[in-house]
């Protein structure tokens, strides 16, 4: 198991994001589904170019609720990641936009400047979650699965995962203030607004 620190210099990044985007908390749904769709599209391109074995299964993205565990799970069978890629794209790059936000827009009043200038992406999950976990496995042959976990601080853990198939599963452990998103009707409303309702699955 590897323990590390997110490569950011402002430890107050997540509290600032939460403050600025509080009224837009549901944007995490759009961002994470979009990321999942992108992962599938990337795999399709690699397969078309002969750089990946064609998929023998239908491509799918799903959003599910587990009310008992108080979590929302976003899953896809796209390109996936290995441990090195998780380290690069999640522990480093995903939070760089947030740091830029702190440096450039902390004293400004228009949150739309942030939304328009930087993709909220992965770290928007911390608008509603106390902890985020990732189980992922790369499309690459003989690749080992990876498991990443972070509670919203600058510390995270990265170790070998348990995922047996290609793709990524992101679990958001919803905080007390955001339990409204554990209601199927609420999540359905958000997905409908972003024309993503076909991805919904309830494990209530």
Language-model features, listed with the residues they occupy:
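Low-complexity basic/metal-binding stretches
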Residues: 194-204
């Amino acid at each position: 198991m590897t323990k590390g620190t997110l490569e950011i210099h402002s430890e107050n990044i997540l509290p600032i994001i939460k403050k600025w985007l509080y009224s837009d908390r549901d944007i995490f749904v759009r961002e994470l589904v979009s990321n999942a769709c992108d992962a599938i599209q990337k795999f399709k391109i690699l397969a078309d170019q002969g750089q990946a074995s064609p998929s023998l299964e239908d491509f799918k993205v799903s959003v599910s609720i587990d009310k008992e565990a108080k979590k929302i799970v976003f899953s896809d069978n796209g390109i996936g990641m290995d441990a090195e890629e998780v380290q690069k794209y999640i522990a480093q790059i995903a939070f760089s936009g947030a740091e830029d936000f702190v440096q450039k827009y902390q004293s400004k009043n228009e949150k739309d400047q942030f939304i328009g200038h930087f993709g909220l992406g992965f770290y928007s999950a911390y608008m509603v979650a106390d902890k985020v976990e990732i189980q992922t496995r790369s499309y690459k042959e003989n690749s080992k699965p990876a498991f990443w976990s972070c509670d919203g601080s600058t510390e995270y853990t990265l170790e070998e995962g348990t995922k047996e198939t290609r793709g990524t599963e992101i679990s958001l452990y919803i905080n007390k203030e955001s339990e409204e998103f554990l209601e199927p009707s609420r999540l359905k409303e958000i997905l409908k607004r972003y024309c993503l309702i076909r991805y919904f699955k309830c494990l209530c």
